[in-house]
From Swiss-Prot:
It is found in: Cytoplasm. Residues 159-345 form the OBG-type G domain. GTP binds at residues 165-172, 190-194, 212-215, 280-283, 326-328. PROSITE patterns: G_OBG (PS51710), GTP1_OBG (PS00905), OBG (PS51883). Monomer. GO terms for molecular function: GTP binding; GTPase activity; magnesium ion binding. This is GTPase Obg. An essential GTPase which binds GTP, GDP and possibly (p)ppGpp with moderate affinity, with high nucleotide exchange rates and a fairly low GTP hydrolysis rate. Plays a role in control of the cell cycle, stress response, ribosome biogenesis and in those bacteria that undergo differentiation, in morphogenesis control. Residues 1-158 form the Obg domain. It is an enzyme of class 3 (hydrolase). The lineage of its organism: Bacteria, Pseudomonadati, Campylobacterota, Epsilonproteobacteria, Nautiliales. Its cofactor is Mg(2+).
Length: 357
């Protein structure tokens, strides 16, 4: 479990100014006041959206504002209301007051909409202030100020994709290339000593969460190396990406079979989870080494998808994919991102169907 926090300021719109106006028409010498009311300022509304998976689209945004109401006009015309600010958040997001820590909203259901801050009321036009003693009021109300608040959006994340590989297989480099995570990276084993999560953005609203897990060694299920502790972290991931280091002294097929064995020894359920294979550091070996991996495991080569490099062997089907990549040389990184997102979405749909029965 990983908690994503975003702190930002939000402000509702100011109400529009009331209008000072008098009726001016032919043959009407002393028309009375007819100034319209200002429009209401826009609200700050939080909307729960199941198609939004993370809070990454709010990163780096310090202040978000709803629109102000428009001023009133003559002939008692009401000013237009300001446009609401809609904050789209994934289910499970909690909104807190940044200063006090008080929970303001708890968003759970898809489609749920709640007003966080109301916009300011529009000012009254001068026609409201006419009376026997003052039939030509030359003042109108100003619009009410909007409300401003610093909030914290908090979301508990479970990784969609767990990266599984031997130490120094390129997991940290990949997650830092694809996401906003910045793990420590160096050319020695066991750089990653704790699991790190990164949010991989596919577009403005779609994203998935990737976990960089400490490298597995033989005997991990017995607690060797960093052992059982990190295997717990991938139990709840929906998809496993095996990271096979083509430049390693360990044979690629041996790496894959050993990693599968370690997961199976720890948990049959974990080993049976949907997976894909990334053949890392492909720029450091000849194509023949990649083809040899395909042949030894009986993997058929298919047409590339997601604009993968057509000069490198790859495999795509409805359940999995095998893709050579290089984070450093930026080979097939975009293809990997879209292929993983496609796999994660398929797994989520399958899980929802199973839970509905």
């Amino acid at each position: 479990m990983f908690v994503d926090n975003i702190k930002l300021k939000v402000k509702s719109g100011k109400g529009g100014q009331g209008c000072v106006s008098f009726r001016r028409e032919k043959f009407v010498v002393k028309g009375g006041p007819d100034g319209g009311d200002g429009g209401k300022g826009g609200d700050v509304i939080v909307e729960c959206d199941k198609n939004t998976h993370t809070l990454s689209h709010y990163k780096g945004r310090k202040l978000l504002k709803a629109k102000n109401g428009r001023p009133g006009e003559g002939r008692k015309k009401h000013g237009a209301n300001g446009e609401d600010l809609i904050l789209k958040v994934p289910p499970g997001t909690v909104i807190k007051n940044a200063e006090t820590g008080e929970v303001l909203l708890d968003m759970k259901e898809d489609g749920e909409r709640k007003v966080l801050l109301e916009g300011g009321r529009g000012g009254l036009g001068n026609w409201h202030f006419r009376g026997p003693r003052n039939q030509t009021p030359r003042y109108a109300q100003p619009g009410e100020e909007g409300q401003e608040l610093e909030i914290v959006l908090e979301l508990k994340l479970i990784a969609d994709v767990g990266l599984v590989g031997f130490p120094n297989a390129g997991k940290s480099t990949l997650i830092s290339t694809l996401s906003n995570a910045r793990p420590e990276i160096a050319n020695y084993e066991f750089t990653t000593l704790t699991p790190k999560l990164g949010v991989v953005r596919v577009d403005e609203y779609r994203s998935f969460v990737m976990a960089d897990i400490p490298g597995i060694i033989e005997g991990a299920h017995e607690g060797k190396g960093l052992g059982i502790e990190f295997l717990k972290h991938i139990e709840r991931t929906s998809t496993i990406l095996y990271m096979i280091d083509l430049s390693s002294y360990r044979d690629p097929v041996y790496q894959f079979k050993t990693l599968q064995k370690e997961l199976k020894e720890y948990s049959e359920k974990l080993a049976s989870r949907d997976y894909a294979i990334a053949l890392t550091k492909c720029d450091s070996v000849e194509v023949e080494k990649i083809e040899e991996f395909f042949e030894k495991l009986g993997i058929s080569k298919t047409e590339p998808k997601f604009k993968a490099d057509p000069n490198l062997p790859c495999h795509f089907d409805d359940k999995t994919f095998v893709l050579p990549i290089s984070s450093v040389a930026n080979i097939n990184i975009e293809a990997l991102k879209f292929a993983l997102f496609d796999l994660v979405e398929k797994n989520k749909r399958k899980e929802n169907e199973e839970n509905s029965f």
